[in-house]
């Protein structure tokens, strides 16, 4: 097993990493938990909030609005200044889905006002315009169809393909958007362990939550109840990994979101981990040194599946 991914050319000198506590600046972010959507300042103060139910995906928009899910099947855009929903799309009703079991756990705003939406249950990925017109649709390959768990996060790649975290199948699949064919897939390993039920640190499985494509072509995967993040090559070789107890003083539980920052750091979502564990962890993948954590369990509770940093200059992969 390689010590460092081929994506990273960082030279590490042990004498540079002696601090026992996180040393990076804190982040401003938007997050949902305990029945509220909130913007948290870098100093930890809540600078904005409104009542809002649970989410699995979130996107800060260039106009200063935020796009989130509302309920099980609706995508909504909120004007932060007024706290009003200024646009929405209900997958339970639109474009042939009326009367069908549908849940939405992933979506993404695209260029020209298009929105990509992954519809679990009916098993498709669609793109719509802001009038709700169906512009494209593509069927998902599903080994174990599930209205609640067909997908977690889905992202459209620069080449136009879809990278899909298919939770119930335990697989990442990359689809050619034009043909619907799977052009690459990876089954998240169980690492020789038996599946265990639950949502917290005691659980185990390969019900992944997110996958992002790195600039070098490797894929970074948040394994959900696998309590880990792994990086795999196009040839499906694991070249980097961090597991449940690899980070001192931190227990990973349901590992959800991934943000790859311009400085190559990873920000990892740590859901259902219980009090005493951070909700977000920023680490340097070259050293696995934790450089920042977000620990607001008392404010946001034990179910914080998604968030987004708001103060990072440059392109973030998420």
Give the residues covered by each predicted segment.
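Bacterial N-terminal signal peptides
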Residues: 7-20
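N-terminal secretory signal peptides that target proteins for export/translocation
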Residues: 1-6
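Histidine-/acidic-rich catalytic cores in large beta-rich domains
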Residues: 24-318
């Amino acid at each position: 097993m390689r010590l460092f991914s081929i994506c990273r050319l960082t030279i590490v000198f042990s004498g540079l990493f002696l601090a026992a506590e996180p040393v990076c600046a804190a982040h401003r972010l938007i997050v949902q938990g305990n029945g509220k959507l909130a913007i948290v300042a870098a100093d930890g103060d809540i600078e904005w909030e409104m009542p809002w139910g649970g989410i699995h995906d979130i996107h800060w928009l260039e106009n200063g609005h935020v796009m989130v899910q509302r309920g099980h099947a609706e995508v909504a855009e909120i004007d932060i200044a007024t706290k009003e929903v200024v646009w929405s799309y209900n997958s339970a009703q639109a474009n042939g889905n009326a009367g069908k079991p549908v849940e939405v756990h992933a979506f993404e705003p695209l260029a020209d006002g298009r929105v990509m939406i992954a519809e679990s249950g009916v098993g498709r990925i669609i793109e719509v315009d802001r009038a709700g017109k169906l512009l494209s649709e593509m069927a998902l390959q599903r080994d174990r169809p599930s209205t609640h768990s067909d997908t977690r996060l889905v992202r459209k790649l620069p080449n136009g393909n879809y990278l899909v975290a298919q939770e119930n199948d335990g697989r990442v699949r990359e689809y050619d958007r034009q043909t619907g064919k799977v052009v690459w897939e990876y089954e998240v390993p169980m690492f020789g362990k038996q599946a265990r039920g639950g949502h917290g640190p005691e659980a185990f499985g390969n019900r992944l939550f997110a996958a992002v494509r790195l600039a070098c072509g490797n894929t970074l995967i948040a394994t959900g109840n696998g309590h880990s993040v792994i990086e795999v090559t196009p040839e499906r070789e694991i070249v980097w990994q961090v597991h449940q107890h690899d980070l001192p003083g931190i227990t990973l539980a349901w590992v959800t979101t991934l943000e790859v920052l311009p400085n190559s750091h990873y920000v990892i979502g740590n859901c259902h981990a219980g009090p005493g564990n951070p909700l977000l962890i920023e680490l340097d993948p070259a050293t696995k040194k934790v450089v920042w954590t977000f620990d607001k369990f008392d404010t946001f509770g034990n179910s914080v599946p998604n968030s987004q940093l708001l103060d990072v200059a440059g392109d973030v992969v998420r």
